[in-house]
């Protein structure tokens, strides 16, 4: 029954009941809209897979990830102002994130250095290295050249401080002569019969190549862009051996 009384209804009409029915519906719509927004900024739509079951937007997820990276570096003194950091870069997503984050740390250090009057704390250096593994994975020279050019473009597009890119063949672990090194590398790899053993050997040679180059060129920190899946594989593999 409709009520048109301006002084308030004293009869048993359904006006209040109708208002009660509307209120929960409005709240439900509001709650649904909030659930479709980023839990941090409350402004953008969440991105699937961007942390905490996809509840963050891309910008907030990136900001949160960088904050954790910076906290881990600062809390454990992984990078100090006097360090020279070598980033192992493959071009994959993990190494790209590692390079970008350490670049942003270096940028912040550079801004603090420029703003300080005494300039007592130097800015840590950053270099980038790419390991050429064509001695193990034979690919056309044009493909590896294109890949190296793409990596050079990625590194050069980073804002200052400038970072030097180094390209080292994996066989350089044996000797400085490319021909002799490649021959010795092939001989060693061919001596391992199973595929898993060859992959393990390649991993060890890759790490030795990176460590050798870092020590010979003044780098005292080596940064690897390893994802959690790769680390988990290494742990499981080492456990069952």
Show where each model-derived region lies.
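ATP-dependent adenylation/nucleotidyltransferase module used to activate substrates
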Residues: 2-241
């Amino acid at each position: 029954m409709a009520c048109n009384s301006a002084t308030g209804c004293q009869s048993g009409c359904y006006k209040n009941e109708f208002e009660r029915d509307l209120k929960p519906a409005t709240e439900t719509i509001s709650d649904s809209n909030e659930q479709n927004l980023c839990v941090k900024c409350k402004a953008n739509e969440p991105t699937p897979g961007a942390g905490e079951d996809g509840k963050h937007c891309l910008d907030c997820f990136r900001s949160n990830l960088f904050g954790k990276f910076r906290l881990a570096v600062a809390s454990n003194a992984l990078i100090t102002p006097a360090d020279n950091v070598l980033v192992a870069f493959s071009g994959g997503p993990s190494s790209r994130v590692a390079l970008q984050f350490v670049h942003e740390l270096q940028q912040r250090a550079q801004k603090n250095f420029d703003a300080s009057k005494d300039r007592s704390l130097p800015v840590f250096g950053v270099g980038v290295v790419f390991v050429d593994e064509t001695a193990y994975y034979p690919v056309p020279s044009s493909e590896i050249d294109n890949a190296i050019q793409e990596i050079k473009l990625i590194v050069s597009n980073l804002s200052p401080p400038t970072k030097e890119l180094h390209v080292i063949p994996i066989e350089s672990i044996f000797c400085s002569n490319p021909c002799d090194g490649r021959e010795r590398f092939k001989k060693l790899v061919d001596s391992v019969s199973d595929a898993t053993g060859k992959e393990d050997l390649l991993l060890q040679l890759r790490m030795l190549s990176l460590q050798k180059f870092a020590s010979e060129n003044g780098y005292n920190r080596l940064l690897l862009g390893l994802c959690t899946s790769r680390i988990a594989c290494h742990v499981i593999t080492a456990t069952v051996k």
